[in-house]
């Protein structure tokens, strides 16, 4: 079974439970934080990659208003079914759901922002996907990645063991590599790609150090794009906040 097929099967089977967890009060606050990182204005166009059941839609729609546009992209039918139900219940005419591969999103033109929450860890190599997301941004556009990982705080050693067990339990498919290690490697690679593509980035951790939120802004002039600045330069100048 391919990684894509395994992911579709897993999340399609657990869509109802996923939606319940994704909208739990504590998790909801994480999603608000991610939406705020995009600094959306009324009328903006924002695309969510791997939108799942649409748990982020209310926060994105609230910020772009009725004159803006929200597009959710996901590959799993079960997830999208619940996302469409959420849109229909709310009566949002400017929120759209598209079944497509988030690594190759069918975007017709530049957008103001791209959001991906707990998504890049599913990609064997997230670099091409992240690069395409940044390329889809208009000058000055923002991208935000929210992901979970082991905490580096001193008290977290026993909790990290529980975290690794949780990741193994919820990982679609089974492989020889530790799911927790694979997740960490993929998330780090995705963050490095954002830093290499965006002149300005900000990173913060919260949730006892288990959650990391990276925000990147595409350059407004001809200097935007690959190679400006290098990943090393971006990391050196990146403001880092912890909570």
Where are the model-predicted features located?
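Conserved class I S-adenosyl-L-methionine
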Residues: 1-39, 55-59, 82, 157-167
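C-terminal alpha-helical "lid/dimerization" subdomain adjacent to the S-adenosyl-L-methionine
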Residues: 24, 146-212
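A short glycine-rich, Lys/Arg-flanked "PGG" loop and its adjoining helix->strand segment in the class I
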Residues: 127-139
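A short acidic, Gly/Pro-enriched loop at the edge of an enzyme's catalytic core
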Residues: 103-114
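Class I SAM-dependent methyltransferase SAM/SAH-binding core
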Residues: 47-49, 53-104
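A short SAM/SAH-binding and catalytic strip from SAM-dependent methyltransferases
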Residues: 113-126
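Core SAM-dependent methyltransferase catalytic element
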Residues: 192-229, 233, 238-243
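Helix-to-beta-strand junctions that scaffold the AdoMet/dcAdoMet cofactor pocket
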Residues: 65, 123-124, 137-138
């Amino acid at each position: 079974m391919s990684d894509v097929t395994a992911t579709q099967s897993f999340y399609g089977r657990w869509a109802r439970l996923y939606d319940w967890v994704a909208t739990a009060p504590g998790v909801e606050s994480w999603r608000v934080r991610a939406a705020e990182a995009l600094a959306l204005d009324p009328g903006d166009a924002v695309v969510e990659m791997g939108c799942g059941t649409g748990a982020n839609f209310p926060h994105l729609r609230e910020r772009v208003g009725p004159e803006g546009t929200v597009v959710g992209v996901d590959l799993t039918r079960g997830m999208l079914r619940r996302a469409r139900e959420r849109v229909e219940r709310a009566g949002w005419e400017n929120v759209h759901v598209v079944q497509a591969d988030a690594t190759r999103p069918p975007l017709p033109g530049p957008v103001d922002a791209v959001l991906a929450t707990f998504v890049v860890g599913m990609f064997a190599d997230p670099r091409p996907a992240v690069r395409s997301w940044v390329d889809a941004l208009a000058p000055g556009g923002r991208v935000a990645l929210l992901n979970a990982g082991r905490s580096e705080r001193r008290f977290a050693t026993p909790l990290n063991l529980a975290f690794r067990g949780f990741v193994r339990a919820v990982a679609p498919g089974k492989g020889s590599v530790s799911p927790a290690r694979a997740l960490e490697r993929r998330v780090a690679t995705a963050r490095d790609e954002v830093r290499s593509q965006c002149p300005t980035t900000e990173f913060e951790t919260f949730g006892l150090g288990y959650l990391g939120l990276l925000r990147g802004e595409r350059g407004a002039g001809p200097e935007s794009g690959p190679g400006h600045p290098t990943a090393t330069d971006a990391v050196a100048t990146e403001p880092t906040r912890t909570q």
